[in-house]
């Protein structure tokens, strides 16, 4: 009845080890189906992302423990030269449940509250379910984890506030202008940072986005993705600066892309209508003296990182609330696990009494009418329900320090003379 979690993540191993041990979707399917078909596991699932590769396994035999699974994965990836068992963590029983609840609720992420991980856990479960590798335990474990994540998102602020430079820039623009749908945006640079900023802008309802890049085709590709199809040649974009309410720069350069003189002329043409410049470049893309101009709001990476740090601090203050939700769900999950342990005894107990009832009724089958026999059957059913109520309730009750599930099971089986159940997961 054990659930083992074994894996590497950003806390236990450097990126080169995480890259070496990660599994593609094809490898994921091959790995978990191999565990099942070889008789090593009843159930298996793998969560594999850039920051973690984690196995969740219900062993089929005693020999399948944490150390076995570490070696099994290392061997599967042919990574014995690079990867060592000490790069792994191991969790068991409720420790496994706690871990996946923390992962799904984004408090085990590299960036606290980063919500992308929930989708990755859901994808891992989808793969396990589609390959018939997710049985009753992993299915319940995952659905409880999804429920935990939903409660954490709705009842805490752990995922609120920008914690990336590009998203912080967009949030700042929204705070200043409120309605971005009415604003015209210029993106200078179509690299990874610029692309993220543009997509965040689009999510905040900014639709009038114009893109310029040294390589025009790259700007055109991003514009097509956003559905704007609005680009400017890099050589001439400065002629249009006055048209924009928000300017985002994210380009690799040793010289300033925008200087004070250019922006001064732009502001004259704009009749001093406010402009936000979000400088996401490193080195900086915009001359700091631009901030001296009237109605010109310039924010660079350092200013945005200050916002990010404050948001991370706010998220950290939500951790006690998140942990309280996890603890509550852990108790419920543990109680459910306990019901699985007592289920065979409950079934055997009910079966024995039903068998006794049917034998006794059979003795009267030809001595009474069919109508009377049915009344007797209904009566004995009610009696059996009342007789079995207390022992079943006792088996299902939460455990405390004075007893255990095995002791309860043994007591009931001895009192009612039940045969030992067949061992299965």
Swiss-Prot record:
Database matches in InterPro entries: 4pyrrol_synth_GluRdtase (IPR000343), 4pyrrol_synth_GluRdtase_dimer (IPR015896), 4pyrrol_synth_GluRdtase_N (IPR015895), GluRdtase_CS (IPR018214), GluRdtase_dimer_dom_sf (IPR036453), GluRdtase_N_sf (IPR036343), NAD(P)-bd_dom_sf (IPR036291), Shikm_DH/Glu-tRNA_Rdtase (IPR006151)
Site (Important for activity): 99
Pathway info: Porphyrin-containing compound metabolism; protoporphyrin-IX biosynthesis; 5-aminolevulinate from L-glutamyl-tRNA(Glu): step 1/2; Porphyrin-containing compound metabolism; chlorophyll biosynthesis
Binding site for NADP(+): 189-194
Recorded GO MF terms: glutamyl-tRNA reductase activity; NADP binding
Catalytic function, reaction form: (S)-4-amino-5-oxopentanoate + tRNA(Glu) + NADP(+) = L-glutamyl-tRNA(Glu) + NADPH + H(+)
EC numbers, comma separated: 1.2.1.70
One GO BP: protoporphyrinogen IX biosynthetic process from glutamate
Entry binding sites for substrate: 49-52, 109, 114-116, 120
Active site per the UniProt annotation: 50
Disulfide bridge partners, by residue number: none
Function: Catalyzes the NADPH-dependent reduction of glutamyl-tRNA(Glu) to glutamate 1-semialdehyde (GSA).
Domain notes: Possesses an unusual extended V-shaped dimeric structure with each monomer consisting of three distinct domains arranged along a curved 'spinal' alpha-helix. The N-terminal catalytic domain specifically recognizes the glutamate moiety of the substrate. The second domain is the NADPH-binding domain, and the third C-terminal domain is responsible for dimerization.
Note, other: During catalysis, the active site Cys acts as a nucleophile attacking the alpha-carbonyl group of tRNA-bound glutamate with the formation of a thioester intermediate between enzyme and glutamate, and the concomitant release of tRNA(Glu). The thioester intermediate is finally reduced by direct hydride transfer from NADPH, to form the product GSA.
Family membership: Belongs to the glutamyl-tRNA reductase family.
Subunit structure: Homodimer.
Name under which the protein is recorded: Glutamyl-tRNA reductase
Source organism of the structure: Pelodictyon phaeoclathratiforme (strain DSM 5477 / BU-1)
């Amino acid at each position: 009845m054990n659930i083992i979690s074994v894996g590497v993540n950003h806390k236990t191993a450097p990126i080169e080890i995480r890259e070496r041990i990660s599994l593609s979707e094809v490898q994921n399917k091959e790995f978990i189906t191999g565990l099942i078909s070889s008789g090593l596991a009843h159930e298996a699932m793998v969560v594999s992302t850039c920051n973690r590769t984690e196995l969740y396994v219900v062993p089929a035999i005693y020999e399948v423990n944490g150390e076995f699974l570490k070696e099994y994965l290392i061997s599967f990836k042919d990574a014995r030269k690079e990867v060592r068992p000490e790069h792994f963590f191991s969790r068991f029983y409720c420790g496994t449940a706690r871990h996946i609840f923390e992962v799904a609720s984004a408090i085990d992420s590299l960036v606290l509250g980063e919500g992308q991980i929930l989708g990755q856990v859901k994808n891992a479960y989808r793969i396990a379910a589609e390959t018939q590798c997710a049985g009753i335990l992993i299915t319940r474990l995952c659905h409880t984890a999804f429920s935990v994540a939903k409660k954490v998102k709705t009842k805490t602020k752990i995922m609120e506030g920008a914690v990336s430079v590009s998203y912080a820039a967009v949030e700042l623009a929204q705070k200043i202008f409120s309605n971005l749908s009415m604003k015209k945006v210029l993106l200078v640079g179509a690299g990874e940072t610029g692309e993220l900023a543009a997509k965040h802008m689009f999510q905040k309802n900014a639709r009038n986005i114009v893109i310029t890049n040294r390589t025009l085709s790259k700007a055109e590709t991003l514009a097509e993705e956003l559905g704007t199809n609005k680009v400017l040649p890099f050589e001439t974009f400065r002629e249009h600066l006055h048209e924009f309410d928000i300017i985002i720069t994210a380009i690799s350069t040793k010289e300033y892309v925008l200087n004070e003189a250019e922006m001064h002329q732009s502001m004259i043409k704009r009749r001093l209508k406010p402009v936000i410049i979000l400088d996401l470049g490193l080195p900086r893309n915009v001359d700091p003296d631009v901030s001296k101009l009237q109605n010109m709001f310039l924010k660079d990476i350092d200013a945005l990182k200050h916002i990010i740090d404050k948001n991370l601090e706010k998220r950290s203050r939500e951790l006690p609330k998140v942990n309280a939700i996890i603890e509550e769900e852990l108790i419920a999950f543990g109680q459910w696990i306990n019901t699985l342990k007592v289920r065979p005894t409950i079934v055997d107990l009910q079966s024995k009494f039903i068998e006794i009832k049917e034998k006794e009724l059979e003795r009267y089958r030809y001595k009474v009418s069919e109508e009377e026999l049915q009344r007797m059957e209904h009566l004995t059913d009610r009696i059996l329900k009342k007789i079995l109520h207390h022992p079943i309730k006792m088996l299902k009750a939460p455990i405390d320090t004075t007893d255990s599930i095995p002791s309860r099971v043994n007591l009931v089986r001895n009192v009612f003379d039940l045969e030992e159940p067949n061992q299965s997961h």
